[in-house]
């Protein structure tokens, strides 16, 4: 029995009219737009028959803007006003790029929150640059299809964080596009291959693009695409292979510093050489620099492979981790899908084939497969698809949680949870009379907040004054289909509420996610010990506060010996808090608790007597 469909909010359910939707692969090097026509997905060409649009934008003196091939051809002569690889900059800060800015031929601004590029038309951000690319693709699609697009699906690397995803949506909004969904690039590839070939089983999507690397382990069955695990590196791609070849060229010719024009010239030449080496055993680089210095260098395929083999091996580290996360052995993988133009490099194909012991799948164009999958997804979300429906389940790559008293990280949504999702958990106050609570949202696998990544903070105010532990605050985490997080907190008795959309103003450092996962495994034992101690400290401080408050009110119930015994227990406990282990602290807590049992009984009797004073038997 086929499942009934429920359209997304704002989507028309009218079945009789085909609604124009498109899939966009917003790439580091090239971008594409595709759509479904007559039941088949296809990339849309420009007026000259080219489906790929170079992701390059040039700002002209007359106020005009060039996008694509014409802009690309001007990189050598007008590097400061010609921006490429904006995808590597979007949603990031200068601090994230500290390792590679020296070979990027741009004039960066000093803004520490958002990357700014100085051009002849003023300051431009990566969001604005990306918007120009999206505008061009939008125009191409609407001219080809003969109508306005109702929406688009835009693909992003699976390892894009909230800031990078939100920045991508901002670029689409500037371009006048309605984003139906952001779709992870490996997932888009799986959609294209799964639907075309009706494949079932466990597949790995190996996606090496111009600026990013992603890997996804997917379980494909009839009607269900489930992402079992993801991994990757948001700062590893074909550009890094170019950079190694670029540095080698500088070394061979005794060059240390170049002006922007010469940098762009040599970068374009090493990219061309890299592409030649996929079909030729040797490539030659010839140029004349602006100072008249001639460059004439040859590089063999073997030399290029040796120069960049460490980058290829670097991609296999997250592949290994993703397989481990999914609980899948290499021998259980039915097929490996190669995505991204950088997978055309022969030593990449050879390394992947050796690792998995099988030839990777490549019957779809690796440059187009992501856009095709996005087009298929857009067609479904626009309400055009009527048969053979399937379900897509994506996952979040890192755990999300919040800080609890004592600096502990409480995980609300574990890593590799299927999204979209929503989860709630109840929390309470730590102090008597507490009327506000700070919600600190964190990301990571470690047990202590200090070892996790801080995402956002907000404050819930208006909590009714109560005894510690009496209030009930429900915190809800929601991740939408684009992987964007919103967090809300509500006090249950009054309904007072606060919430926040998590939009960090900065991205993760290069390889940060991989490091976070590795650190969580390497430090698991130490983290659990630290958490146990922190929990013991919280318990000790709570008991100490309660006993001190009771002594202020009712110490007259105790004789000198009892009072001294309790005060000594408090002192012993405070001493253990300084450098004692978790078991030492808990032992001192138990000792203090036992010493106050008689005191607690006396206080209860007094309170009962106070409650009964002046009451008649009939009223009891």
Swiss-Prot record:
Signal peptide: none annotated. GO terms for molecular function: ATP binding; ATP hydrolysis activity; ATP-dependent protein folding chaperone; unfolded protein binding. SUPFAM superfamilies: Actin-like ATPase domain, Heat shock protein 70kD (HSP70), C-terminal subdomain, Heat shock protein 70kD (HSP70), peptide-binding domain. Pfam families: HSP70 (PF00012). InterPro entries: ATPase_NBD, Heat_shock_70_CS, HscA_NBD, HSP70_C_sf, HSP70_peptide-bd_sf, Hsp_70_fam, ISC_FeS_clus_asmbl_HscA. Coiled coil: none annotated. The keyword Cytoplasm does not apply. It comes from the Bacteria. GO terms for biological process: iron-sulfur cluster assembly. NCBIfam families: HscA, PRK05183.1. Chaperone involved in the maturation of iron-sulfur cluster-containing proteins. Has a low intrinsic ATPase activity which is markedly stimulated by HscB. Belongs to the heat shock protein 70 family. This is Chaperone protein HscA homolog. It comes from Neisseria meningitidis serogroup A / serotype 4A (strain DSM 15465 / Z2491). The gene is hscA.
